[in-house]
Structure formats: structure tokens, C-alpha cells
């Protein structure tokens, strides 16, 4: 068998055994989806996969269950089979490829004071290396096992912080005996536009502090009625919120809420990785913290001396890249559990986009584009003064390998990579005012892009460069826009708090959310706390998050029940 055939067998094994996260990363790394599947008709791939499954059952059993080392001498002499391991010490925590595994067992208090036991396998050595690091790039050690955060013990209200010991190496969590907090103050807001609109289409979820950013956790197949998103707020507060939409019933609850040790620091970025196993937060001080899906801190980086302005995972979840206002780029390698910094010797890094699994492009206030590889600290290629002014946004279309850049010099440019790897400009879109928002419609078919200049949103064909539609509904400059993943909707928000949801098929207004302060906005044209800072679609396009600098986050619900 050649390499491709071996890869195909491994891919089939991962797929049929339900290892969805590993299968996703393996597909992206090997390009297995582009290989010839006809080979499977001439070889008994199913039989080979069955052999792999049987052979690895014992390996998985050894990984998922832990010997009770405190058992008496007679018990230790007795051979322990798989069934007894399952009954005595089942592991309660999930496995990931990128972090050392810690087994949670049902040990008695005499065996363990906190109910957690370090798994005695090859991961022990990796964990010891992480905890013993004392040189190199500064980072916080892995959190002690006793700091594991259980979802049921944490309340979003953060009411009692007096009895919590503040440790600068880890976040502060408030422990409560009460169950998960149910958010009961959900209210409805007024809206206009569209036909057959339900009165509960927009939901307002209150928060403890003003919201600065949010991101959806990738949808888990085992519970497709529950959607989880994480939000970052002022005062260094992080929270995870779950919403349940089943049988027209909308419920929201707080899974956990954390108070970081960096008080009075706004959270500037939040990003889930593609498999939903790790969550990264960035602070105005430049600190970056990584958490697992249960809310436990894994690592903390202190390389940046300025606010982190861009925070993005690579497509395979292998790397995390962060761009800072001090011109520093921080890279974290999940597989090696290492991180390092790149000093761009330039001004602020405003945005970062991954263009392959190990390459990314950056933009800065000088209007330059730089391409980096993860294994080097010098740029692979540079386009100096790609724009006459700062490049405020980057969007890369991986399917057609085109880069879109937006600048405050009132232009948007379309780029492709030449034979030497450097970006070359294909076309310039000129506007009458600075451009702050751009996005790609990533549906299959003709590539479409959207540009917002002042209060006008334009949609173009990226191949013919023809203008397809112009949306003129906003009365204030557009501050955020986003296409849904299925390409059916375009959401736009402005500095006055107005939000419009457009049909991409008909180029007509689908739904609209008005501002609560329309009279005041008509005079001032802007209210900082009303400005729409971000729009985030859920992975199945059923819900849309609307974020402002207010103590609330708005959720637009049930898009799947509306037909265009």
C-alpha cells in the first residue's frame, strides 16, 4: 500500500469510530477528501478497519481507565480486566490530542483529597515538562487539579469574591452551592420588516458588565438543541452561556463565569477553536489565556505589551495567532505546547488571517501586508504600502485563494498570490469614505463579497467584479457586517445600534432591529454604547449574536424556520 491508501484506512477508522475532532484535523492535514475513494472497492477496507478497531480497543481501555493505586496488596495481585476497570475507576473527562490528559476517577477521600488522579501514562511526562518549565518564553503553568471548575458550582452574578484567594497565575472563579444560573430576565425588543415575523424573534440576554466580544462554540452533534457561546466583558469577566431552543421554547443559562486576576482590563478578543475543545481570551493589557471546554485555564501568555487586536486559530486547530498593538505577534503551538513571539518591527498589527494550515498574513497601520510561516520569525513576503493608509480588515477566501483588504484610505483591494508567494493586487474598489467592514460569502458557487462604506453596503461578484446589489437602509455608518455560513443572509449593524438582516437571494430587507434611542441618535448620529461592535452567526446559521458596548447581548433566533 502507498501512503495515500494508508491515510485512507486511518481516515475511515477515525470516521467510523466517531473521532470527529481528530478526523477533522486529519482531513485538513492530509487532503484525504481529495483522494481516489475507488480504491476502497478493490480492497476490503472495512475488514482492515475492523482489525484496527479490535487492536486499539485495549489501548483505549488503558487510556480511559486508571488503576486504583491505593488498593490493598491482595487486590493488587489480582489481575484487573477491562470490566473491573470500567466499574471501579471510570474516566469522566474527554480526551484531546493537544493537551495532557488528567483522569477524573471515583477515588475515595483517603485516596485523593480532590477526586482527581494524574493518569499514569505517557502524558505524565508531557505534563511534568509543562509544569517544570522555568526558562524560555514566559507562560503560566498548568492549573493545579484542585482548581478544576465544575459547571454546576459557578454563578454568573459573581456575588461573593471576598473568600476567593487571588492568584495572578490563574483566573478567579466564584464557587457557589447553587445550580447553574438560569437567566430569567430575557426580554424582547421591537423590530420591523419582513413578513410573518414572530414577536419573539429577538431576545435580549442581560450580563453583569458591558460586553466587548463573543464567539460561538462549534455545535456538538450529541446535543443539537443546545447552543453555547462565550462572551468577554469589561472588568476582565468571562462567561459561558447556553441557550436551548426546543419546541419553540427559548431558555438561557450561565454554565460558568470567571473573573480573571487582571482587574479592570477589557477583554479584547475571544475565539473558540474549530473542534470546540479550547477557548482563547485576549486582554487589553496584552495577556492571552487559554481555557478548556469546562472553564479551566490551561496556559497564560504575557508576551504582548499592548492590547491584542486580532486572535485567530488555524484551520486545523494546531496554532493560535495573536496580533498586538505593540507590533508583536504571538504564536501558540498546541501539539508541542510551546509559544513564541515575532517582533514585526512595525506599528500595530491590526488583523491576522490564516491562508493555509501553517501560513498567515498580517496587516498594520502603515498599510503593509506581511506573510509568515509558523516555523520562521521573518516574513516570507512583504507588500509595503499595499494601501496608502492603515489596513483595518483582512478576509481570505480559502476556496478561491483570494485576499480582501479594507483600508481607511477609502479603498478595498482584491489580491492573489503570485508564483513567488507574494500577494499581487488584482483590482481596486474605490469609495467616497473610509471602509471598516468587509466579508466573503463562502457558499458554493460564484464568490461574492460585501463592503460597507459609511452607511451604504455594496455586494460584488469577485470574478466579474460586477456590483450585484446596494443596500441603503442604515442612517448611521455601518460598523459590522457578516454573511451567514449558508450564504442566504447578510447581517449589518451600525453605530446607532440599528441591525438589518438582508436576503442575499432577493437583495431585500428580511428583518430589522431598531435602536431604543432613535431620537437622540438623530441629533448626535452616534452613541458609543449603542454601536454594534460584532455580529456572530452560529455554525448552523440558526442564531445570530449582536454585541454592543452594553450590559446585554442580543440573540436573533430561529432562522431555520424562515424561508426566503
Swiss-Prot record:
WD repeat ranges per the UniProt record: 262-302, 303-342, 344-382, 386-425, 430-470, 473-512
Gene Ontology, cellular component aspect: cytosol; nucleus; Rpd3L-Expanded complex; Set3 complex
UniProt KW Transcription regulation keyword: yes
Domain LisH as annotated: residue spans: 2-34
Phosphoserine carried by residues: 137
Summary of subunit composition and partner proteins: Component of the set3 histone deacetylase complex.
Main subcellular localisation: cytoplasm
SUPFAM superfamilies reported for this sequence: WD40 repeat-like (SSF50978)
InterPro entries: Ebi-like (IPR045183), LisH (IPR006594), WD40/YVTN_repeat-like_dom_sf (IPR015943), WD40_repeat_dom_sf (IPR036322), WD40_rpt (IPR001680)
Pfam families the record matches: LisH, WD40
Keywords of this entry: Chromatin regulator, Cytoplasm, Nucleus, Phosphoprotein, Repeat, Transcription, Transcription regulation, WD repeat
Protein name: Set3 complex subunit hif2
GO biological process, one term: regulation of transcription by RNA polymerase II
Localization of this protein: Cytoplasm; Nucleus
Keyword Transcription: yes
Any one GO molecular function term: transcription corepressor activity
Transmembrane segments: none
Amino acid at each position: 500500500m502507498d501512503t495515500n491508501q494508508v491515510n485512507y484506512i486511518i481516515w475511515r477508522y477515525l470516521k467510523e469510530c466517531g473521532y470527529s475532532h481528530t478526523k477533522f484535523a486529519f482531513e485538513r492535514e492530509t487532503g484525504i477528501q481529495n483522494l481516489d475513494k475507488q480504491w476502497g472497492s478493490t480492497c476490503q477496507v472495512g475488514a482492515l478497519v475492523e482489525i484496527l478497531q479490535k487492536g486499539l480497543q485495549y489501548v483505549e481501555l488503558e487510556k480511559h481507565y486508571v488503576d486504583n493505586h491505593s488498593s490493598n496488596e491482595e487486590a493488587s495481585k489480582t489481575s484487573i480486566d477491562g470490566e473491573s476497570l470500567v466499574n471501579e475507576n471510570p474516566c469522566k473527562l474527554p480526551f484531546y490530542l493537544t493537551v495532557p490528559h488528567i483522569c477524573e476517577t471515583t477515588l475515595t477521600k483517603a485516596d485523593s483529597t480532590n477526586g482527581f488522579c494524574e493518569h499514569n501514562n505517557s502524558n505524565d511526562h508531557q505534563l511534568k515538562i509543562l509544569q517544570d518549565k522555568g526558562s524560555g518564553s514566559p507562560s503560566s503553568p498548568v492549573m493545579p487539579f484542585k482548581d478544576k471548575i465544575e459547571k454546576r458550582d459557578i454563578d454568573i452574578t459573581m456575588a461573593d469574591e471576598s473568600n476567593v484567594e487571588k492568584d495572578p497565575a490563574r483566573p478567579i472563579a466564584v464557587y457557589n452551592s447553587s445550580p447553574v444560573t438560569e437567566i430569567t430576565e430575557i426580554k424582547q425588543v421591537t423590530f420591523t420588516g419582513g413578513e410573518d415575523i414572530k414577536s419573539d424573534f429577538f431576545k435580549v440576554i442581560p450580563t453583569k458588565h458591558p460586553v466587548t466580544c463573543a464567539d460561538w462554540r462549534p455545535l456538538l452533534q450529541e446535543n443539537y438543541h443546545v447552543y453555547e457561546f462565550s462572551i468577554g466583558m469589561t472588568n476582565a469577566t468571562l462567561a459561558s452561556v447556553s441557550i436551548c431552543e426546543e419546541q419553540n421554547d427559548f431558555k438561557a443559562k450561565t454554565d460558568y463565569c470567571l473573573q480573571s486576576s487582571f482587574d479592570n482590563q477589557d477583554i479584547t478578543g475571544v475565539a473558540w477553536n474549530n473542534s470546540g475543545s479550547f477557548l482563547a481570551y485576549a486582554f487589553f493589557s496584552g495577556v492571552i489565556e487559554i481555557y478548556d471546554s469546562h472553564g479551566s485555564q490551561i496556559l497564560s501568555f504575557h508576551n504582548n505589551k499592548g492590547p491584542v487586536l486580532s486572535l485567530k486559530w488555524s484551520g486545523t486547530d494546531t496554532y493560535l495567532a495573536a496580533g498586538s498593538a505593540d507590533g508583536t505577534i504571538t504564536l501558540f503551538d498546541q501539539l508541542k505546547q510551546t509559544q513564541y513571539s515575532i517582533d514585526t518591527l512595525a506599528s500595530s498589527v491590526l488583523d491576522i488571517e490564516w491562508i493555509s494550515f501553517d501560513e498567515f498574513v498580517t496587516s498594520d497601520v502603515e498599510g503593509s501586508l506581511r506573510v509568515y510561516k509558523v516555523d520562521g520569525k521573518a516574513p516570507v513576503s512583504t507588500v509595503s504600502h499595499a494601501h496608502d493608509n492603515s489596513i483595518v480588515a483582512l478576509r481570505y477566501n480559502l476556496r478561491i485563494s483570494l485576499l480582501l483588504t479594507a483600508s481607511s484610505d477609502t479603498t478595498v483591494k482584491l489580491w492573489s498570490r503570485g508564483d513567488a508567494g507574494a500577494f499581487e493586487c488584482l483590482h481596486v474598489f474605490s469609495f467616497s469614505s473610509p471602509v471598516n467592514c468587509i466579508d466573503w460569502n463562502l457558499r458554493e458557487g460564484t464568490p461574492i463579497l460585501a463592503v460597507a462604506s459609511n452607511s451604504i453596503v455594496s455586494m460584488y461578484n469577485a470574478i466579474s467584479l460586477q456590483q450585484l446589489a446596494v443596500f441603503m437602509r442604515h442612517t448611521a455608518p455601518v460598523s459590522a457586517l457578516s454573511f451567514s455560513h449558508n450564504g442566504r443572509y447578510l447581517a449589518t449593524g451600525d453605530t446607532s445600534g440599528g441591525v438589518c438582516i438582508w436576503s442575499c437571494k432577493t437583495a431585500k430587507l428580511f428583518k430589522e432591529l431598531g435602536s431604543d434611542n432613535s431620537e437622540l441618535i438623530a441629533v448626535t448620529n452616534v452613541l458609543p454604547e449603542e454601536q454594534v461592535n460584532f455580529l456572530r452567526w452560529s455554525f448552523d446559521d440558526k442564531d445570530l449574536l449582536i454585541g454592543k458596548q452594553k450590559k446585554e447581548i442580543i440573540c436573533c433566533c430561529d432562522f431555520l424556520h424562515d424561508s426566503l
